[in-house]
């Protein structure tokens, strides 16, 4: 029977970052960790010989070429992590991306594969950040109702067995056309559960994959974004009254109109 400890695979660009990340985890949770392994991030190089690979990824028509290359690199890096799990035949596998930041005490390995963090969005992913998802998850494992919501981002994925990792690896290789990895996992409904509250968030920084702002992905993944405000309708702005002073915004003497100066 496998030891009930984590085998952690950290995707990052160099060994120095890996050593720092793994050291922090070991310092606090040595009793819960069996092994940590570095998975080098994949920085793909576009040449005249391989530019056809850009057509393999299904994206919006206006997606920048640089972003497509990064998303393909993300898929390639996760394939390497899955292959490492298969090669090592490890259980209780936690795949972390470089920006995964531990938010709560590391729990004991869950009994099933799950998201250990992410962003909960509507079933139509294009409505993410626009339509609010109203759910009240309990502490621990929660079932994903794909008719009501999906989870995107791939910074912390928990895969229970090497067999499951092998199955997922096969799924990422077979398609003629690929999707961004998080969209692919959501559309395939690969993970059936998520752990709440989020064990890992994306730390505040500019994402190397999607160029999002420094804090945006942090708030999206903090408790799965359930407490994050969604975009509302545009507020109507009051028009200035005619004849109002542009310098001091003062009202005309004797005017009964309310001051409409923007504050």
Annotate each PLM feature.
Residues 2-96, 100-239, 262:
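An acidic/histidine-cluster motif and surrounding catalytic segment
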Residues 232, 239, 243-244, 248-249, ...:
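Small-residue-biased low-complexity repeat regions
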């Amino acid at each position: 029977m496998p030891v009930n400890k984590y085998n952690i695979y950290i995707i990052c660009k160099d060994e120095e970052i890996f050593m720092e990340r793994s050291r922090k985890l070991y310092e606090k949770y040595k009793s819960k960790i069996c092994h940590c392994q570095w998975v080098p991030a994949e920085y793909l190089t576009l040449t005249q010989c391989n530019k056809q690979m850009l057509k393999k990824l299904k994206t919006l028509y206006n997606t920048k070429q640089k972003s497509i290359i990064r998303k393909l690199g993300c898929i390639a890096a996760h394939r390497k992590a899955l292959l490492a799990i298969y090669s090592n035949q490890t259980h209780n596998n936690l795949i972390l991306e470089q920006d995964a930041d531990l938010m709560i005490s590391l729990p004991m390995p869950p009994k099933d594969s799950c998201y250990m963090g992410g962003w909960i969005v509507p079933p139509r992913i294009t409505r993410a950040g626009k339509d609010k998802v109203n759910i009240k998850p309990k502490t621990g494992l929660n079932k994903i109702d794909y008719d009501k919501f999906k989870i995107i981002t791939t910074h912390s994925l928990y895969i229970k067995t090497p067999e499951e990792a092998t199955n997922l690896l096969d799924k990422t290789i077979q398609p003629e056309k690929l999707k961004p990895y998080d969209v692919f996992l959501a559309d395939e409904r690969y993970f059936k559960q998520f752990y709440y509250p989020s064990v890992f968030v994306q730390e505040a920084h500019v994402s190397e994959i999607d160029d999002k702002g420094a804090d945006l992905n942090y708030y999206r993944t903090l408790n799965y974004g359930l407490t994050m405000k969604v975009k509302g309708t545009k507020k109507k702005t009051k028009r200035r009254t005619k004849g109002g002073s542009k310098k001091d915004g003062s009202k005309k003497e004797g005017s009964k109109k309310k001051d409409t100066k923007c504050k």
